Regions:
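A short glycine-rich, Lys/Arg-flanked "PGG" loop and its adjoining helix->strand segment in the class I
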Residues: 106-118
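Class I SAM-dependent methyltransferase SAM/SAH-binding core
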Residues: 34, 40-82
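A short SAM/SAH-binding and catalytic strip from SAM-dependent methyltransferases
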Residues: 91-104
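Conserved alpha-helix/loop element of class I SAM-dependent methyltransferases that forms part
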Residues: 12-31
Length: 242
């Protein structure tokens, strides 16, 4: 599985939102900016700013690839639950499709707050809520159930997105704005569909028989060809101030 391709695809879903929120948060005036869970650098590689950019991730392989895509960024191998930075270091700290994967998302937000300067901003650009996923036609509901179970097997919290704003509040972050991302469920191009199915096949391998995966993949393709496919996963964002 080419994860940089996947992360780059996810980055397209939030590009307009990121432009809006980074402007609101004063990206052009910031001196230091941190991405927690930077992965392969899909977001960092797109940032245009004079600020000193920093990225942290728990996966050494992802960081190695991030160095290729974002060579000017200061990268650190570390855990979001215990950030290896002094208090009040950054003007902006953000994450992207991260908190659902974190064992203790509230602690991660507390740490993000700790390393953010007074008056600085914390942004969570995208956190999905798979517990309210919609799949149509009904024959594809099973796919959603499988994917949700797969996330749980991998240690994720599929319903975290709906609790994002609550978690900001509990972490003591003053919320400026929160809501759901619009347009994530738009009809994918053939290439995007193949990327999506590469992720599905990777996730389901080992606990769903291969023939069942291929059967539901054909059903998905046929439903899209008939114009009947509906897939909606509510995906939340929040940004606030320290």
């Amino acid at each position: 599985m080419d994860w940089h391709t996947r992360y780059t695809q996810q980055a397209t879903w939030t590009r307009d939102l990121r432009a809006y929120l980074f402007k609101k948060a004063g990206l052009n005036q910031a001196r230091r900016v941190l991405e927690v869970g930077c992965g392969t650098g899909a977001i960092l590689s797109e940032l245009v700013t004079s600020a000193s950019l920093h990225g942290l991730d728990l996966n050494p392989a992802a960081l190695a690839e991030c160095r290729i895509h974002a060579p000017k960024v200061s990268l650190v191998h570390g855990n979001g639950l215990s950030l290896p930075y002094p208090d009040a270091t950054f003007e902006i700290v953000y994450c992207h499709f991260l908190l659902l994967w974190v064992r203790d998302p509230l602690q991660a937000l507390v740490e993000m707050k700790r390393v953010t300067k007074s008056g600085g901003y914390i942004i969570a650009f995208a956190e999905p809520d798979y517990s309210h996923r919609i799949d149509k036609p009904d024959e594809l509901i099973q796919l959603g159930k499988w994917q949700t179970e797969s996330l749980q097997r991998q240690g994720a919290d599929p319903g975290f997105g709906a609790r994002l704003a609550e978690s900001f509040f509990e972490a003591g972050i003053k919320i400026n704005e929160t809501g759901t991302i619009q347009g994530v469920e738009k009809e994918p191009s053939p290439g995007e569909w193949e990327i999506e199915w590469a992720v599905i096949e990777s996730d389901l391998a080992g606990f769903v028989p291969g023939e069942d995966i291929q059967k539901i993949k054909r059903l998905d393709q046929q439903a899209r060809a008939r114009g009947e496919r509906v897939l909606h996963v509510p995906t939340y964002f929040a940004w606030g101030q320290v």
